[in-house]
Structures are given as C-alpha cells and as structure tokens.
Design a protein with these regions (language model features):
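N-terminal glycine-rich FAD/FM-binding segment characteristic of electron-transfer flavoproteins
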Residues: 1-183
C-alpha cells in the first residue's frame, strides 16, 4: 500500500509521514511553496509555486504529484489552503474528502462531526482522501530517503489573483497539540 501526504508545516510533514508509515509500506510527501523535509518519506515532491501566487493555484502540480505516485490513500494536513487542494484533488478523482479523521482501522476510519462532539466510523469507496492532524498517530517515527523531485508550476486556466496580504499576529494555542481542551 502507498500513502500520499500533503502537508505545509514541518511538524505536520514529520507527523503525517510517520503516521502514514503505520498504514502503508511506501510514503510519498508533497509540499507546495516550501522545501519538503528529507528523511521522512520514501519520495518527496516539491510543487513549485511562483512568488506572489496563492497556494490554490498549485492544484495542477499537486494532481501531477498524485498521478506520479499512484497512491492508495491521501493524508492531508487540515490547513485552509490544503483543504482546498484536497477538495480539488478529490473532485478530479470523483470522490469526496473525509474530514477530521482521528483513527484508522484497516479501511475503516473514525472521524469527528458536530464540532468534535461525536465520532463516526466510515469506509471510503473509491479513492481515499482524508484530512487528519498529525496527533491522530501515536508515537510513530518518520523514516525515509532524501529523494526529492520538483514538479513544475502549471498555471491554471482561471487563476486566483492575489490582490494583497496583511500580516496577522499568531495568537492562542494549537488545539491539535493539546491533550485536553476544556470549554
């Protein structure tokens, strides 16, 4: 079995690749706009994105990396940009993204709904595309090679245009790393 990991942050790259190793024999990592970590996957794809382009415009590159890898399962770090890329990939594959996966048991996954108040077990039919936080996997270790391939940028037919950006200070805790949340 082969797993395809799409992640932005270095922590998520390491955690999701380690977790993917527990459910698959081969792990492939794809990163848009930033160098992929080495030593965490069997192969890594650096999906190019020109300066000033929004990440969403790299969807064709992510799809090219997916097609090159031919994976059985896709694990996606649940960031806003990656969720869009996952949705676009799933649409091309004729399937849907299963969000907020917390556990894997063979082909059955457990995911949260109602804002995490309830859990649901389901089995994907067709291509498997899941958003999952790195904390869903216990103390797994990431292993791999330094093999990195660059996927050239392909401009979309109808590209998003970035009109401006504004720095927003980072505040609050990362709830995916908390053991207990009281609220």
């Amino acid at each position: 079995m082969k797993a395809f990991v799409l992640a932005e942050s270095t922590d998520a790259q390491r955690a999701l690749c380690a977790g993917a190793r527990t459910i698959a024999d081969e792990v492939v990592l794809a990163v848009v706009k930033g160098a992929p970590l080495t030593g965490v996957a069997d192969k890594a794809y650096d999906v190019e994105l020109p300066e000033g382009q929004p990440v969403e415009n790299a969807a064709a590159g992510v799809q090219a990396a997916y097609e090159a890898a031919q994976p059985d399962v896709v694990l996606v770090e649940p960031t806003p940009r990656n969720k869009i890329l996952a949705g676009l990939l799933a649409a091309k594959l004729g399937t849907a993204v299963v969000s907020d996966v917390t556990a894997f048991d063979g082909d059955t996954v457990t995911n949260m709904y109602f804002g995490g108040l309830a859990a649901n077990k389901q089995k994907a039919t067709g291509a498997k595309v899941y958003t999952v936080a790195g904390t869903a996997f216990a103390e797994a270790e990431a292993t791999g090679s330094d093999d990195v391939e660059t996927i050239a940028y392909v401009a979309p037919e109808k590209a998003l245009v970035l009109r401006g950006t504004k720095a927003v200070p980072r505040e609050g805790a990362d709830l995916t790393k908390c053991d207990v949340v009281v609220g």
